[in-house]
Every structure is written in structure tokens, then in C-alpha cells.
Curated annotation (Swiss-Prot):
Name this polypeptide is given: Protein phosphatase 1 regulatory subunit 14C
Keyword Cytoplasm: yes
Encoding gene, per UniProt annotation: PPP1R14C
Keywords, ordered alphabetically: Acetylation, Cytoplasm, Membrane, Methylation, Phosphoprotein, Protein phosphatase inhibitor
Species this chain originates from: Homo sapiens
Biased composition (Low complexity): 1-12, 35-63
Length: 165
């Protein structure tokens, strides 16, 4: 068995190492000894192009996988996801203060950000929030005003609906 090394900057950068090692059987017969090939060291030279072709194929597969994984971040931008997460954490914190309890003890309150973003006006959004917070005994006006301010400029994360023609 001969050893061929091949390196590529993309392969090395992806795995964190420099050169990659590939094991390739010699071409000159099934279990031959090193002396059975026509020239000394020729099996290593013959297998090197095969190993680099295999390395190129693996690099191409890794790039395709990265491209497929990248589709998720194209559909849902990481920056938008982070903004959404920060907003949701802020909402949970504010609801805890409004209801005067921990998250586990909080009554079931559903605030759908995408639903709010679908609303045509701030008045409609405020109305939906007031309906969701009807059981809250503390004043909710400040929370509603701040939430409406925070969602301004955000985009919906739900997949777009197909329009019927």
C-alpha cells in the first residue's frame, strides 16, 4: 500500500490541518511487494494523481455541503434571527415584570411577532397586543409602545406564501 499526500488551502482551512493523507493500493497487482512493481517508487508516483483527484472531489463535496447549509442563512438572515431572539428575550423579561412572576408561573400569553408584522397599522398591532394582555393587572401601555417601537423595521421570518394568480 502506498501513501500519497495532497493538500489544498480550502481543505486545510476547513479541517484546521495542513496536508491530508490518502491511502491508495498500488496499481501493479493485488498484494504485490514493493519490489514487484516495474520501477522502484513508481507506484507512489502513479497513485499521487489519483489521490489528488480524490482530494479535489472531496473538496468539491465539502463546498456543495457548505452551499446547501448556506441556504438556511440566505432564507433566514443570521442578523435578523439574532434581532428576533433578543426581542423575544426582552418580551419574556417584560411579561415577567408585568405579571409579577417567573416565566414558568406566567399565564399562557401568545405574542406572535410575525402576526404583528402582518398588521397594517400600529393601531391594529396595539389592539392585538391589548387582547393578548387582557388578563394583566398592571398597566401595559408602556410595554406595548416599546414593543411596537422595537418591531418597527423588522421583517417576517415565516416562509413567504405563494400568491395565486
Amino acid at each position: 500500500m502506498s501513501v500519497a499526500t495532497g493538500s489544498s488551502e480550502t481543505a486545510g482551512g476547513a479541517s484546521g490541518g495542513g496536508a491530508r493523507v490518502f491511502f491508495q493500493s498500488p496499481r501493479g497487482g493485488a498484494g504485490g511487494s514493493p519490489g514487484s512493481s516495474s520501477g522502484s517508487g513508481s507506484s507512489r508516483e502513479d497513485s499521487a494523481p489519483v489521490a489528488t483527484a480524490a482530494a479535489a472531489g472531496q473538496v468539491q463535496q465539502q463546498q456543495q455541503r457548505r452551499h446547501q447549509q448556506g441556504k438556511v442563512t440566505v432564507k433566514y438572515d443570521r442578523k435578523e434571527l439574532r434581532k428576533r431572539l433578543v426581542l423575544e428575550e426582552w418580551i419574556v423579561e417584560q411579561l415577567g415584570q408585568l405579571y409579577g412572576c417567573e416565566e414558568e408561573e406566567m399565564p399562557e400569553v401568545e405574542i406572535d411577532i410575525d402576526d404583528l408584522l402582518d398588521a397594517d397599522s400600529d393601531e391594529e398591532r396595539a389592539s392585538k397586543l391589548q387582547e393578548a394582555l387582557v388578563d394583566c393587572y398592571k398597566p401595559t401601555e408602556e410595554f406595548i409602545k416599546e414593543l411596537l417601537s422595537r418591531i418597527r423595521g423588522m421583517r417576517k421570518l415565516s416562509p413567504p406564501q405563494k400568491k395565486s394568480v
